[in-house]
Amino acid sequence: MKSLFKVTLLATTMAVALHAPITFAAEAAKPATTADSKAAFKNDDQKSAYALGASLGRYMENSLKEQEKLGIKLDKDQLIAGVQDAFADKSKLSDQEIEQTLQAFEARVKSSAQAKMEKDAADNEAKGKEYREKFAKEKGVKTSSTGLVYQVVEAGKGEAPKDSDTVVVNYKGTLIDGKEFDNSYTRGEPLSFRLDGVIPGWTEGLKNIKKGGKIKLVIPPELAYGKAGVPGIPPNSTLVFDVELLDVKPAPKADAKPEADAKAADSAKK
C-alpha cells in the first residue's frame, strides 16, 4: 500500500523519467508480425534504431497531450521539423535562441501547471467537504476533533492498537467519485505496518477498532496528502477507505539486559 506512505517529488520524477518510454511503448498499437519485422529491417541495429525512434515519438506525443491539458498546444509539424533540421545540422535557431526559447517554455509550463493544480485543489476541497458533511449524517457515523469522519462497522475484540504497534490490515481505498486507487483484496495480500508510519487519518482511525474489527474512514486532505497529492491521488483529495483490522502486534518491550549490565558496571566502579 505505497499510496499511504510518503512519496518524494524526486522519486516520482525519476520514476516518470525512467519508465515513460517503456510505458508509452506498451500503449502502442498492436506490433507488426514477425514476418513484417524481418522484412522491414536488415539487421538488429536498424531495428533498434527504429524502436528508439518509435519510443521517443510516443513519448513526445504523450507530452504534447499533457501540455494540451494545461492549455498549451504546440505545432506537431514544427516539432518534427525541428528534429529533422537538427539531424541535418540546419537548425533555424541558434543554440542561444534554442536555450532561451526552451527556458521561456519551461516557465510557461510550470506556471500553467501551478494554476491548474490550484484550481483542481480548490475544486477537490469543496467537493470533499460536501461529501464528508453528507456522510457524517449517516447512522453510526462520527466526526473527530481533527475532522476525521468514520463509521465503525464491527468493533472487534481485545485492545485497540497503539502508535507503536504493528497492524495487519486488508483495505480498499477510493476517491469520493468511487475511483479505486488501492486495494489489498485484489492483490490477495494484506498489508503489515507500524501504525504511526502511515498518513494521520489511518493512525487515528484504526484506534477506534480492535482486532477483527472493520471501519470506514473518510479522511480529509489535511489528514492525508493535502495540497500536494501523490500519483493517483489529486491535490486536496478526500479519501475513502474500508479497512479490516486482521491483527495487532504490540511493539516489543525494551530488553532489560542492557540496563542490568549498566548497573553492574556502575557497581564495579564503586
Swiss-Prot record:
Any one GO molecular function term: peptidyl-prolyl cis-trans isomerase activity
GO BP annotation list: protein folding
EC category name: isomerase
SUPFAM superfamilies: FKBP-like
Keyword Isomerase (UniProt): yes
Domain PPIase FKBP-type: from-to ranges: 164-249
Family annotation (Pfam families): FKBP_C, FKBP_N
GO CC entries: periplasmic space
KW ATP-binding (keyword) present: no
Signal peptide: 1-25
Family annotation (Gene3D superfamilies): 3.10.50.40, Peptidyl-prolyl cis-trans isomerase, FKBP-type, N-terminal domain
EC number: 5.2.1.8
Subcellular location: Periplasm
InterPro entries according to UniProt: PPIase_dom_sf (IPR046357), PPIase_FKBP_dom (IPR001179), PPIase_FKBP_N (IPR000774), PPIase_FKBP_N_sf (IPR036944)
UniProt keywords, alphabetically: Isomerase, Periplasm, Rotamase, Signal
Reaction(s) the record says it catalyses: [protein]-peptidylproline (omega=180) = [protein]-peptidylproline (omega=0)
Membership in a protein family: Belongs to the FKBP-type PPIase family.
NCBIfam families, per the entry: PRK10902.1
PANTHER family for the chain: 39 KDA FK506-BINDING NUCLEAR PROTEIN (PTHR43811:SF19), FKBP-TYPE PEPTIDYL-PROLYL CIS-TRANS ISOMERASE FKPA (PTHR43811)
Free-text function comment from the UniProt entry: PPIases accelerate the folding of proteins. It catalyzes the cis-trans isomerization of proline imidic peptide bonds in oligopeptides.
Record-given protein name: FKBP-type peptidyl-prolyl cis-trans isomerase FkpA
Annotated organism of origin: Escherichia coli O6:H1 (strain CFT073 / ATCC 700928 / UPEC)
